[in-house]
Amino acid sequence: MTTLHILGFPRVGAKRELKFAQERYWRKELAEQDLLDLAKALREKNWLHQAQADADFVTVGDFTFYDHILDLQVATGAIPARFGFDSQTLSLDQYFQLARGNKEQFAIEMTKWFDTNYHYLVPEFQKNTTFKANSTHYVNQIREAKAAGHQVKPVIVGPLTFLWLGKEKGEAFNRFDLLKQLVPIYFEILTALAAEGVEWIQIDEPALALDLPQEWLAAYQDVYAQLAKVNAKLLLATYFGSVAEHAALLKALPVDGLHLDLVRAPEQLSAFEDYPKVLSAGVIDGRNIWRANLNRVLDVLEPLKAKFNQRLWIAPSCSLLHTPYDLAVETQLQQNNPELYRWLAFTLQKVAELQVLKQALNAGRSAVAEQLNDSQTAADARANSNVIHKAEIAQRLANLPANADKRQSPFAERIKLQNKWLNLPLLPTTNIGSFPQTLEIRHARAAFKKGELSLADYEAAMKKEIEFVVRKQEELDLDVLVHGEAERNDMVEYFGELLDGFAFTKFGWVQSYGSRCVKPPVIYGDVTRPEPMTVRWSQYAQSLTDKVMKGMLTGPVTILQWSFVRNDIPRSTVCKQIGVALSDEVLDLEKAGIKVIQIDEPAIREGLPLKRADWDAYLQWAGEAFRLSYMGVKDDTQIHTHMCYSEFNDILPAIAGLDADVITIETSRSDMELLTAFADFKYPNDIGPGVYDIHSPRVPTAGEIEHLLRKALKVIPKERLWVNPDCGLKTRGWKETIEQLQVMVEVTKKLRAELAE
């Protein structure tokens, strides 16, 4: 018989129940016991869904109140010493303080979990870190599930991945040196799990899909030789990429089974066909929302079944944490877009797909002929749908002129033409894009969406806000203005709603971090722009002022990265389609007299593949898609872009290759350190380094901004330096926004006068 198991389940509930309960708890509106009871009910529901789908085990230990890597920091005693908490007796309040900070300590840093849109809390390791086992989190969930009558498989992230994902703090050392102390702690935790009578323990080592240094790889043999002494079978789970290059190492590890991601890396299967133990085949996509073609999946699984027999397990490619909970609640989508609805599968539907596969493998395809037929019909309909495939778009992409993604003239010539008409002072000041979104603005948008506010009233509300934003910027004497983006709820959703080829769910939420969930748009078909999206707002804003108004768009790579993307054509093609659609908007803005246009790309770096060898290909198509988004603009139109991340050094040639006339970046928190990289690289175009951190309501002093600007002037020629905040101001309040910008403008004017002498 084939074994079915799940690597992990979403934690937040079908309708984000956990999120709302957490937030009420933080506001002191919910008692701790009520939060614990709700969490227990969610776990029981998750286990029941797995059991009802004929899973041979329910997975435990995957549920968390905030983050599974934070749970592991508690379980190994590796919580940051700076908090002064004891990991053995940590209260729920203290747990949340680690994640969210308190009056004395800032929160543990957060970063992306591999190349997903989930964020984990980064372990802080010090030379003198001492570990201490605390298996309570896992043991309690095992007992709870067993009490409900389930067969249980706990999951824990492995020691090498855990250590790799952390950062060294304090005195310089190599965190790898902590491994020999960490492994006995893991052994202690696993022993406690085995003592609960579990047959299998799943240990996740996704770091194996990265370019790990040789000493880390070499350590796997010794680490797992020690852990294998535990009185339970170990399933080593890899995901997010191929581990074929480590096949010899993995086959030699003294574990009892291996999980492979055959969705992300189907080609790796050939390297493991002679694997002598349990092989868990990750065949249902744990990261996207499309139904699988089950006949095709069986074409892969049936030969494996013949070879492995009882040793074949089936599973999703990775944890289902990255997919929404249940498609069945999307009644609106089913009504408005029944065709698309039939092509989708959320977590519960993916579990049901695995159940069908298990039945087919155990009793033959005829036992599930109806389900397989339904799956095939949906796959065929999707392959041939004219809702998805539009000949004119394929034609447009195919017929792009040879240098479509190149400006007419080099930057040195363009900037002269731009400066001539812009006539800006030295160190021009501007904003990144958004201004504070008041409750009134949010209410007006929501009421308009629900049909409770007429179009005329909605437009009047937006225009009133735009005028307010323009007047405030004039009073502050900023040089290049923005319209403030009052009409936008989200920088990707706004454009997705106005582009063809996108759809939206109502409950398609996935966890980003803690209680924060995101609802990515669904890119299901060829992308076009039926009509202008931003032109009237920018044009209206420009009509209110003699100053220069900047148009604001989200770039193609960010739209791609923050969406669920169709899987029937390459991501690179989807990205180019978005770029070409945006170029129509850019040219319309230019025609409307908006000749400074910002195309935001905060997610270019996030899209980098896990392995360095794949970077160039990605950066090439991402760069091309970005340049296509402004194809055809005149030399005197100034293209800006904005990016916010802390690491540029390794991708600077690609950033320069975007050929934006001005790039604004987030630099205030790193004390302008980033700029040195731009200077060393001799970055050729204009730069606007952020001079204050918008993530804090704190108003910077004139001295702080002056210090940052003087540092910037040391490495960037004054003629090429812009002055701006780190990021958009959407989440700030008006009071601090005005005060922050006032300081920024005053300091700039002071330095301007000094430089003019």
UniProtKB/Swiss-Prot annotation:
It catalyses: 5-methyltetrahydropteroyltri-L-glutamate + L-homocysteine = tetrahydropteroyltri-L-glutamate + L-methionine. Its EC number is 2.1.1.14. Coiled coil: none annotated. L-homocysteine binds at I432, G433, S434, E485, D600. Zn(2+) binds at H642, C644, E666, C727. Binds 1 zinc ion per subunit. L-methionine binds at I432, G433, S434, E485, D600. Pathway: Amino-acid biosynthesis; L-methionine biosynthesis via de novo pathway; L-methionine from L-homocysteine (MetE route): step 1/1. Keywords: Amino-acid biosynthesis, Metal-binding, Methionine biosynthesis, Methyltransferase, Repeat, Transferase, Zinc. Pfam families: Meth_synt_1, Meth_synt_2. HAMAP family: Meth_synth. This is 5-methyltetrahydropteroyltriglutamate--homocysteine methyltransferase. It comes from Actinobacillus pleuropneumoniae serotype 3 (strain JL03).
